[in-house]
Amino acid sequence: MRTSSRMENQASLSSIQRAVWDGKLPLQITLASSESRTYDQTDPYLIACPRISYLPSLLPRLRAFFSSSLIEPNSQPHEGWFSFEGVPLKWHLPVGLLYDLYAGADPASKGTRIDETDHPSSSLSDTLPWRLTVHFSDWPDEELVRLDADGMVMHDAFINSVKEADFLRNGTAKGIMTLSKEDSAGLWQAVQDVDLPSFQRISNILLPPPNQPFRNIPIRFFLPLSPDSGSPSLKVVQSPLPPSIPVATNTSQSTNLRNSPATQVQTLGSALHSLLPNLFPSRRTPVLAKPVLHGAAVPMSAPIEELVRSCAYGDGWAYIVIRMMG
């Protein structure tokens, strides 16, 4: 029975992962008016963009689409960058995370679709399609690292993030460091192509098997700050989080179990309570804030290892946005 239950759980996690990779966001991208021959009369570029993808992958087709409108005809695709309401967007963060951070409507805790392009609710009507601006000049050097024509800056940033996740999962980055050059390039290409089977073939080399727990969980929490806070617009919280934690016991029980302490599964609620107790005073119920991943509110009872196995972005990280309630 235990084997059957484990197989059912694996099938469920695989189904969730497929839904995550199928998730898309409708984007409406406009050329910066200061770079357009027709100011604000240029037609926008519309696309259903995979949530797990990265904005720079759109630059070649955007450069071609807006070529006849550009004041500067010699600009190159890798010189492009994106902004939302005047804020430069970090190109190393996945599209879905950027949307959840800057524009995501209040998510429903039940019945939320990962693919927001299908029948968006009225709460999403004001934020979808997500309206972005693309620029091919005036790179914001103080906020963004420049890209290169060969795409190696983007590739290296992705692989470095994969290395960090690999180290946390296994206690060593040996897996990614010994990955062949072909598989390393293939992992990044699979994310660019949104090719889940090819991605799984390579990523499964790095993941501990289902019956072997992670050493620590690669998960980051993003807390948007108000513009007048005097701090960067985003605060990232990260700490080593094991997949299991000691069970709270009384003194006598603790003495009896000293040599073999009982453990329980680390849930998202227990992790948030330990890292952000002021925002999450309860381990079980969101009171002041809610965790959002891939556009959906995540149950506090979700085991964080299962969450990462099924819902991580292509670099192996679960990026969770903390959204205030009320």
UniProtKB/Swiss-Prot annotation:
State the annotated membrane topology for this chain.
Answer: Peripheral membrane protein
Q: Which Gene Ontology cellular component terms are annotated?
A: Atg12-Atg5-Atg16 complex; autophagosome; mitochondria-associated endoplasmic reticulum membrane contact site; phagophore; phagophore assembly site membrane
For this chain, the site of the Glycyl lysine isopeptide (Lys-Gly) (interchain with G-Cter in atg12) cross-link is K163
Subcellular compartments: Preautophagosomal structure membrane
User: Could you tell me which Pfam families the record lists for this protein?
Assistant: ATG5_HBR (PF20637), ATG5_UblA (PF20638), ATG5_UblB (PF04106)
Write down the InterPro entries for this protein, in alphabetical order.
Answer: Atg5, ATG5_HBR, Atg5_HR, ATG5_UblA, Atg5_UblA_dom_sf, ATG5_UblB
Q: Which UniProt keywords apply?
A: Autophagy, Isopeptide bond, Membrane, Protein transport, Transport, Ubl conjugation
What family does this belong to?
Answer: Belongs to the ATG5 family.
How this chain assembles, per its entry, is: Conjugated with atg12.
Please explain the role this protein plays, according to its UniProt record.
Involved in cytoplasm to vacuole transport (Cvt) and autophagic vesicle formation. Autophagy is essential for maintenance of amino acid levels and protein synthesis under nitrogen starvation. Required for selective autophagic degradation of the nucleus (nucleophagy). Also required for mitophagy, which eliminates defective or superfluous mitochondria in order to fulfill cellular energy requirements and prevent excess ROS production.
Supply the name of the protein. Answer: Autophagy protein 5
Q: Which organism is this entry from?
A: Neosartorya fischeri (strain ATCC 1020 / DSM 3700 / CBS 544.65 / FGSC A1164 / JCM 1740 / NRRL 181 / WB 181) (Aspergillus fischerianus)
